[in-house]
Each structure stands twice: as structure tokens, then as C-alpha cells.
């Protein structure tokens, strides 16, 4: 279980996300198991991941928190058709 993010952490992650380009896109397959695995692997490498909704734009309010839950990450923000997830890197 992840610890909730503090307000200073949220501000820090939002600022860092401004500089990121979307790394992944939610496409026609939606939140398939393969996409969820890809997001999880990307979070393992980068901690902070920006994802764009290319499809399913009408359901983004429901899908964003669902993706965060399925990947064990925090939904830092969702603005327009973009969301940002954060998960600390696993300790080696």
C-alpha cells in the first residue's frame, strides 16, 4: 500500500511533469492487461509517467484512477486528455 502523497510532493511532481512529453498513449485497446504491464514497467524505470488519452477520452475521469489502482501508483494529476502517474522505484 502506498503512502498518500503530501502537498509538497504533489507540487514537485506536477512541476516535473510539465517538462515531460507523454510516454504512453491509451489507444483503441484501452486499459488492456498488456497496456497495464507496459505502464507498470515504465513506472519501474521512470517513477513519473505522463500518459495521453488518444482514445476513450469520454471515460478518462473513470479510467485514470482505475489505471493508478491497477499499477499501484498515485494519480498525480489529470488535465485535459493527459494524466500523470507516480510510483517510487522498487528498492534493489
Role assignments for model-derived ranges:
Residues 1-92:
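Positively charged, polar, low-complexity stretches
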